[in-house]
Amino acid sequence: MASDFIFMLTHADRTIPDAHDRVPEALAAGVRHIGFKDIGLPFASLRRLADTIRAGGAILYLEVVSLDAASEEASARVAAELGVDVLMGGTRPPVVLPILAGTGIRYYPFPGEIVGHPSVLTGTADTIVESACRLASLAGVHGLDLLAYRFQGDVPDLIGRVCRTVAPKPVVVAGSIDRTVRIAAIKKAGAAGFTVGTAALDGAFPARSTRLVDQLTFIAEQASLS
């Protein structure tokens, strides 16, 4: 099955300084799902970036990188002010949901326990699946953002279990997707989409070249394969 490829303008879980200049390359590669994180650039730059992505006709994502309630609340307010299409990440729906109410923003929090930066998914597969089930049952949670390849265990099995548990709500797999075999595993397990940032910027995929437009074109082709 095909999955949505979400290009994140991030490196090592931070929005890159030249993110605005990279958007035309992503659009030229046919990417129509583009996101960034709430750290790495000041708010004014994030607003300009969001406007450019929207003007290009792409769906706009913001992924939260917050380790405490206050910063997660601030991130949700940034998402609301920017008018993103999808807010991904975070672990505190009671903090975020009141802020997003009435905005039309789709919300995909992280299941499981997230620690550190860059973020790591801890716990067992069972506890992560239980967390996913609880989150997906909440009104206002539209899907999940699963840091599957930041988990020490059977990753394809975890993705499949989470996808089956929360269906029909979509699961996006994020973090450390840096090789073709991982994209194939994500799709086979039933995830609706996946994010790539650092790996594309580093030229990690076996595309025609390490140029970003070639990397993104290659990843988009892999995502669209049935």
Region roles according to the model:
Residues 7, 115-119, 202-206:
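A short acidic, helix-capping loop that chelates divalent metal ions and anchors anionic groups
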Residues 47, 122-130, 154-160, 209-215:
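Charged helix-capping and loop-helix junction motifs
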Residues 3-10, 32-36, 60-64, 86-89, ...:
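Hydrophobic faces of well-ordered beta-strands that scaffold small-molecule active sites
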Residues 57, 65, 70-151, 165:
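Conserved anion-binding
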Residues 51-59, 96-107, 114, 166-173, ...:
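Short acidic, glycine/proline-enriched helix-loop-strand junctions
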Residues 27, 54, 101, 187-188:
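Anion (oxyanion) recognition and catalysis
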Residues 1-61, 66-70, 76-83, 133-137, ...:
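Conserved N-terminal beta1-alpha1 strand-loop-helix module at the mouth
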Residues 82-95, 139-151, 176-178, 182, ...:
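Glycine-rich phosphate-binding active-site loops on the catalytic face of alpha/beta enzymes
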